[in-house]
Amino acid sequence: MNDISETPKSCRLYVVFTSTPYRIGRLIRVVTKNPYNHVSISLDGGLDGMYSYARHYKNTPFYGGFVREYSDRYRKEFGDTKVKICALPVTEEQYRRTEERLARMTAESDRYPYNLISAFCVPFHRRFLAEGSFTCSEFALDVLSTVDERFDGRKFYTIREMEQKLDAGKVYEGDYPEPAAGCDDDFEAKQTALFYASHAARNVALRLKCRFRWRRRRGGAPAPD
């Protein structure tokens, strides 16, 4: 591991832990007894360019996937929000690969649904693996396992365990800062029940496809593109 004080700012990834101001977030914090319930990846430490798996819209808590998060998503009028930002030194090659991966996933975000089944397994410290489908902590772990040997992408980590491993790189902890820029997505757009149902059905279909591809791999046949 590189010493963070000797690492150029451009060669750091940032892991952002957040206490989200919504009911599900509060419930998760009660169950886990941890002050933070959400984790994101940032390329520059700013809160107007974070990447994670989360709800797509404010009123669709069970419809989510890969998102680029802007600071407006957690602003104060939605409730009190705390944040903790940890910096992680990486090589130029690791930074470049992570940046390219995030750009690719942003361009194809519809292919990456939220892993609801795995989310319900969290209290039991279990995971449900589905290709391209993660919870926020699973996605952060997947990224971290490619740049930090302390993280094993095959294992289960609680958000608290991730915090503890990254705590030496903490650069900020406290109230969520006021947004520096306007929200560039449709997070606050109201969605109808029909919209919600249609996308829930689509996510089920994607998961079935993931299972089909996994079974074909186990049987030795090549997975379809």
PLM region descriptions:
Residues 1-225:
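Cysteine-nucleophile amide-bond enzymes
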